[in-house]
From Swiss-Prot:
Prosequence residues removed at maturation: 21-34
Domain of life: Eukaryota
Organism whose genome encodes this protein: Agelena orientalis
Protein known as: U2-agatoxin-Ao1x
Origin organism lineage: Eukaryota, Metazoa, Ecdysozoa, Arthropoda, Chelicerata
Disulphide linkage map: 36-52, 43-57, 51-67
GO cellular component, one term: extracellular region
Signal peptide (residue range): 1-20
């Protein structure tokens, strides 16, 4: 019985820590991960076929194979 209560308390503590980060901040962190990589001017591979235009990512068209 004590083990179950301890497990519930630990679960509640972990959940409250996860909820401590606001959703908007979490989304901003995720968007930042998809930003431009400075060393090769390409976006993160997880963002798909995109390249950098300034500091933002743009879609590559069928004729473009690299960023200019």
């Amino acid at each position: 019985m004590r083990a179950i209560i301890s497990l519930l308390l630990i679960s509640a503590m972990v959940f409250s820590m996860i909820e401590a980060v606001p959703l908007e901040e979490g989304l901003q962190l995720f968007e930042g991960e998809r930003g431009c990589l400075p060393r090769n001017k390409f976006c993160n591979p997880s963002s798909g076929p995109r390249c950098c235009s300034g500091l933002t990512c743009k879609e590559l068209n069928i004729w473009a194979s690299k960023c200019l």
